[in-house]
Amino acid sequence: MPAAAGDGLLGEPAAPGGDGGAEDTTRPAAACEGSFLPAWVSGVSRERLRDFQHHKRVGNYLIGSRKLGEGSFAKVREGLHVLTGEKVAIKVIDKKRAKKDTYVTKNLRREGQIQQMIRHPNITQLLDILETENSYYLVMELCPGGNLMHKIYEKKRLDEAEARRYIRQLISAVEHLHRAGVVHRDLKIENLLLDEDNNIKLIDFGLSNCAGILGYSDPFSTQCGSPAYAAPELLARKKYGPKIDVWSIGVNMYAMLTGTLPFTVEPFSLRALYQKMVDKAMNPLPTQLSTGAVNFLRSLLEPDPVKRPNIQQALANRWLNENYTGKVPCNVTYPNRISLEDLSPSVVLHMTEKLGYKNSDVINTVLSNRACHILAIYFLLNKKLERYLSGKSDIQDSICYKTQLYQIEKCRATKEPYEASLDTWTRDFEFHAVQDKKPKEQEKRGDFLHRPFSKKLDKNLPSHKQPSPSLITQLQSTKALLKDRKASKSGFPDKDSFVCRNLFRKTSDSNCVASSSMEFIPVPPPRTPRIVKKLEPHQPGPGSASILPKEEPLLLDMVRSFESVDREDHIELLSPSHHYRILSSPVSLARRNSSERTLSQGLLSGSTSPLQTPLHSTLVSFAHEEKNSPPKEEGVCSPPPVPSNGLLQPLGSPNCVKSRGRFPMMGIGQMLRKRHQSLQPSSERSLDASMSPLQPTAPSSLSFDMADGVKGQC
């Protein structure tokens, strides 16, 4: 049985400054006996759980009182995972509101499919999905750096070098999406977050307010939300492709460099805004910008999609890669699945041995990137371990952590009683023997390698009687026996030698395996789960001794992997002539055969077909409650009181007056619902007329099945 919530709690705080401050990782915590992770990583302090302000608990998560964002149907709150003590972001979706709008339920399903299919360092990771009687919960990794829009508000504008770094990361993430056949369609400053390392994290893949993009009506009566970031062909209700994201990247780049939007009209009119985009009547740029930055920005904001560069061409731009020390981004490919060699053996062993999960369940869940509680525990523990090791340059990532810190004893113990008493008996004898053999000139040189005591200790030694010769012989033999036993056990040189002293000094400086009695503890090799081939049975010879047969290696049940394909093979799929259609499944059929592969081909000996194991669907399904069933109350405590005055509104919130002019917070879907009742459908041909009809989703059974993700075409 998996460990219950609250197991592994520590009596003391996990680390100072755990609420977001600088953590003290210079001195590693001692590992518990038989543990595969240090106590700071595997344990959670009770004070951290008690001090976290929350009003509800759902599963293994505490729903915090701090609100990170809010939309028309969802609220994003800060949460705490009780098994790891790590903070997460939880998107809470109201069931009663969502089930009234099929658009929301469809995009909710789409967001889960896309985020389980995509894996990129600049895209947020979906960890878990939960469902209660009244709400859906999407658990994602927390970005403590906040929103990029807040940073622009504080600095007024970003300098060119910082904006180039953010734009490079954004283009890399969008290029990865386009490679998988996904068009984001709602790239704006509000959807760009910053992690603890000041890197871009892209969010919002399904619940973005883009209903007006589909061409249902013309609801725009205010210059708010997505219209300011939409491409001209999108506003004109023409067929569009992945280049609409390139235009949105240009608008974001302009906002970073200037602090305003590139195209604005007063009073607002959608037709006037479109005409200004077509005429290239961009607002003036700062004079301190370089020529390369201006040329790249104008190329992104090209109104003609044929002349506008695609995402691969934008990623290879000279200005974007100027002064870039790393590998060229256009030559980097990120796999959508973790390989078996990249799994953290320490975390896997901890989850199987300490938390009680099956080894095959942990490996299959992580390799398939299926959002559930197992993936959340692995991701949070691995992230916590990486943060713990970040300040230690002498520890390599390829070495299992068990071989370095698992065997550290909790406290410094005294010497063994027998050895301590032996040193007391032989102290006077060794002192007199050394004084008789060595001349006084050698004592002045301070040859401490052959003298067990310092001068101060020699002067303060009490006088004892000379021991008998029989006792001296017995003590010498016993001392030699102890040294031989230690050397045979550890396999290291004598502790009194110079080599051993240097080796122990290096080991103790890095806080590696060492005991108080100067013995080096033998460390067995870690049990890393890996795929190996079956060994042929060994036939012993007639004269050789019988050898026990080795145990057969564990054959792990693998799942299919959607790896990124080569860039040259599929660039034509993203050509301007190819127009994407908005369907519930984001993966192209043309990419299916070229991107699927099995992880363990060596397991199928004699088989011509690859390993076919169906992908696991999400354990939690979205089933709508019946109208006749009475609602059940959730155990919700009253949240802490909120100040009545409006002086503490965060910058960039919908209620802040300063946030309404430059970076509006409303989306297209919100404005649609405000004016959808009064406006008539446009006479122009809608986008749906030129597309195949969307497949209706049955409201009674709505699940995140990754197998559906490869059937459709975006």
UniProtKB/Swiss-Prot annotation:
Species, as recorded: Mus musculus
TM segment ranges: none
Active site: 186 (proton acceptor)
SUPFAM superfamilies (alphabetical): Protein kinase-like (PK-like)
Spans annotated as Disordered: 1-28, 624-658, 674-714
Protein name: Hormonally up-regulated neu tumor-associated kinase
EC number: 2.7.11.1
Molecular function GO terms recorded: ATP binding; protein kinase activity; protein serine kinase activity; protein serine/threonine kinase activity
Gene for this chain: Hunk
